[in-house]
UniProtKB/Swiss-Prot annotation:
Gene3D superfamilies reported for this sequence: Vaccinia Virus protein VP39
Record's function text: Methyltransferase required for the conversion of demethylmenaquinol (DMKH2) to menaquinol (MKH2) and the conversion of 2-polyprenyl-6-methoxy-1,4-benzoquinol (DDMQH2) to 2-polyprenyl-3-methyl-6-methoxy-1,4-benzoquinol (DMQH2).
Protein's name in the database: Ubiquinone/menaquinone biosynthesis C-methyltransferase UbiE
InterPro entries referenced in this protein's UniProt entry, alphabetically: SAM-dependent_MTases_sf, UbiE/COQ5_MeTrFase, UbiE/COQ5_MeTrFase_CS
Signal sequence, renumbered to the chain: none
Amino acid sequence: MVEDSQDTTHFGFQTVAKEQKADMVAQVFHSVAAKYDVMNDLMSFGIHRLWKRFTIDCSGVRRGQKVLDLAGGTGDLTAKFSRLVGESGKVVLADINDSMLKMGREKLRNIGIVGNVEYVQANAEALPFPDNTFDCITISFGLRNVTDKEKALRSMFRVLKPGGRLLVLEFSKPVFEPLNKAYDAYSFHILPRVGELVAKDAGSYRYLAESIRMHPDQETLKAMMNDAGFENVNYYNMTGGIVALHRGYKF
């Protein structure tokens, strides 16, 4: 049992040692990698594609720019950014999990996306890039899995160019109480069953539901981004606040 609360963190509803969380999260994503895209469509009824499209639209990414798609997984955002930045630009798809990174690389190469995409296994808390490297950073449904979110946000701030922007797309807190109750019922009762049927892994999708509940709400995450140095931070609620897109700038 860990007694020092400064050395513990949350893994879903469990309290675990900080040094254990990364390995526990890694096991979740090793387990779900092969069925990740299928489960995304099933879990969100395909709406995740609209959330990601809105993120792309809010990114302001242009031809020739350099983008970091952090926790990029199977590369949905990277595919879009690759076309936007063109041959003169670059997209780095980074993920801490090698199984997810492998799935992303194979998926993008199979649809002909090569040349301006680089793949890097990286921890968001200690990004292996020089200061002032990227015009835009996105992290999509990944921040809640990070052990030290404040450290990760500071790391993202460091590698952004002045004038660059960070976009955090993440599950958040529904703004309507009836929706909140229905969402809880879906997340804790239906979602694990779907995970068991499709991915043969109810436990990983139970963790998903729990990790969403433990993630900071909209205003708390906004304050965390401000504390990390970002300015003009705002957010957009989507699907009643089930998901929120936060955007902040480095000036």
